[in-house]
Amino acid sequence: MKFLKYSATLFMAGILTIGLSTQALAQSDNYSKAVAAFNKALEQAKANEFESAINMYNQAVSLAEESDNEKAGDLVDRAQSQLPSIYFQLAVTKYKAFQQSQNIAGLEEAMTAFQEAADISEEYGNGQVAQKASNIVTQLLYTRSIIEFKSQQYDAAIASLDEAIERNPNYAKAYYQKGLVIKNQNDEDLDIALEMFDKAIEVGKQVNDNQIVRQATEAGRDNLIYRGVQNMEDKNFARAEEQLNRALEYDAESANAHYRLAELHNKQTNWDQAISHAQKALDLETGGKTELAKIYFELGTALKAQGRKAEACSAFKNAAFGSFQSPAEHEIEFELECESST
């Protein structure tokens, strides 16, 4: 019986030894497979096979984590450190594909890929790639809004811009674009659009985005001048004056705004103000004879009304060009009977 017990003990010890040896071999085999997977991933990444490389790096991590090899932890770290840049490069290829297709579906794929790159980079402690990828997602939201705007999907465009602004409140360009979308969506929402232009100017100055500051300033000015002229033609003079003066708040050196104010004041027989704005417009105008002619005509009109014949004649002579030539000559010859310069 003692022999049988001893034999049984030896048998069980043998099974345990064999089991431990098999486990050790399996762990050693896992590490070897992890190394092979890592090397394969490197080759695939060099060949721009980024999706395959990602899968292989993840496989290397899984295998290494199942191994007790003293080098397994280092292999896990090395594989995970490669993933942020590989995810980012994959996202870049998605973006290049979008550049070829220029459709929303391709753009969405690129955005998703860059967001994945940002998330993976954050998870594995690569803050630089995480920030870069996240910033690109914000820029692509702006790009999406442009596509939506051009296809008159105004609500979708505003939603994209709101998301971009939420991600980056200092994104001056997004405020400017939102103003354009709102203005085009409903022409009656000019005041709301102007709020966006004002915000774009404010943020643009803070981040030194001079191009957006200029564009938003011009948009505010030009839209107010356009609306002011419409109200002037509708004889809504008080509203027109308010809008034209507000245009000057955007651009105090706008020759066009001063010209339109001269025209407006002439219609209301405010001769002194008409002359003042016409003279400012002449000082600021950088265009040629065509642009100057219309200003001189308004100046001549106000001077004539004040009985300042010689000055009015001089103004109308300068106005006698292009589409203003005939009405200016009529004033010179028949209304004022100006002396001939010959």
Residue ranges and their predicted role:
Residues 46, 89, 96-97, 143, ...:
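Register position in tetratricopeptide repeats
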